[in-house]
Amino acid sequence: MKRTAFFISDGTGITAETLGQSLLAQFESIPFNKFTRPYIDSPDKARVMVQQINAAAERDGVRPIIFDTIVNQDIREILATSNGFMIDIFSSFLSPLEQELIAHSSYSVGKSHSIGGNSNYMERIEAVNFALDNDDGARTHYYDKADLILVGVSRCGKTPTCLYMAMQFGIRAANYPLTEDDMERLQLPAVLKKHHSKLFGLTIDPDRLTAIRHERKPNSRYSSFAQCEFEVREVESLFRRENIPNINSTHFSVEEISAKILVEKGVERRFK
């Protein structure tokens, strides 16, 4: 039976959605209709939200799951009148923390994601700009400033991984696509040799690579299975010869790939 889940917040909804998604992912056999509702920051908005929750309960024949990070007690009480199963994230965790720390929390809306006074904000922006400026081997003269350089065949997941690490952790990651010419030379390009300690390889199953490339250039040599199989085989051989740590990206999310790379390379996150 499909269930409905709401991620409700009086701020951006990032915390409610992130934690809620992680919890729901543990129930792989149950399909969910998921809805994020940010900035529910007034009694009127809360009452409209109650109507949506109740409508979903009537439609589904079972009460929705509600993940909320509402700070205002009055708004929380209004939501509690709905026909939903409430998981109040702040109340669940803040009360035990207050007891352990012998201190009262500030109960501030959007505290962890605010820009003002947040030294991480500029780090994040600079890291994202670095990833974009050094994407796809377009520029290589700033590699000395990189924390990591991802290498692999075209369309194996290098760019989204670099951007995720930049956004989430402030990591300055460049990426370089290994071409057929590089494979025929049987060695790393000179620009990569100088930064061998920063290299991490991404590989991918040939059939998956074929499907991805077919969306970009259908019925071309570039997207043919034979070409994809050749490139993957040669790049994996290059990784072994050059002793470059690597991971197959086929069955991992960008979050999992990023975490594995940081652990393998011992790179510290600029912020957590």
UniProtKB/Swiss-Prot annotation:
EC number: 2.7.11.33, 2.7.4.28
Residues that hold ADP according to the record: 152-159
Highest rank taxon of the organism: Bacteria
Molecular function (Gene Ontology), one example: ADP binding
Family: Belongs to the pyruvate, phosphate/water dikinase regulatory protein family. PSRP subfamily.
Summary of the function given for this chain in its UniProt record: Bifunctional serine/threonine kinase and phosphorylase involved in the regulation of the phosphoenolpyruvate synthase (PEPS) by catalyzing its phosphorylation/dephosphorylation.
Protein name (record): Putative phosphoenolpyruvate synthase regulatory protein
